[in-house]
Regions:
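Short connector loops at secondary-structure junctions
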Residues: 43, 51-54
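C-terminal capping/extension of enzyme domains
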Residues: 15-17, 21-30, 53-84, 94-147
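Single conserved hydrophobic/aromatic residue that forms the stacking wall/gate
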Residues: 1-13
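Short, conserved, surface-exposed binding loops centered on an aromatic residue
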Residues: 37-42, 80
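Short, charged beta->alpha transition segments
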Residues: 12, 32-39
Length: 147
């Protein structure tokens, strides 16, 4: 049943998800979950996606430039062109490059550093992307996300 969870992922990815939960807690006062299960987000329309969908164990970026970018760029472009009032959260310098694929007149684009343990203290913590996303959605008459 669980579609998206951190179980089975390496420690680096668990720490990134923990940093995301920590920011949600700081931003919205939500309790930090005890599980990495993201099904509740998906059921509300959240689509968590990395630019590169696989990696060799313990080798960050090892599958970059192996073709994933073509696919994920097409997904981003299709969503941008085919929908309105989406929120794109682009975290990290590599993700920020994807802004060229997004119609910023139709969508909200939020950028900051990556939530990795190495960079989260340099702008991810305190970015308030989750409350900003909800404010934008509500301003468009769309139900906010229960993060």
């Amino acid at each position: 049943r669980d579609r998206l969870r951190s179980r089975g992922l390496g420690d680096v990815y668990k720490r990134q998800l923990a940093n995301i939960f920590k920011e949600i807690h700081q931003d919205l006062g939500k309790p930090i979950p005890t599980s990495g299960n993201l099904d509740r987000w998906v059921e509300q329309g959240v689509f968590p996606m990395n630019s590169v969908l696989t990696v060799r164990a313990h080798e960050t970026g090892s599958h970059r430039n192996m073709g994933w970018e073509t696919f994920t760029d097409a997904v981003i472009k299709k969503l941008s062109d085919g929908r309105e009032n989406l929120v794109f959260m682009l975290w990290g310098s590599y993700a920020k490059e994807k802004i060229a694929l997004i119609d910023t007149h139709k969508h909200l684009v939020l950028t900051t550093v990556h939530p990795s343990p190495r960079s989260a203290d340099h702008g991810f913590f305190g970015c308030k992307h989750f409350s900003k996303a909800n404010t934008f959605l509500q301003s468009k008459g769309i139900q906010k996300i229960d993060w």
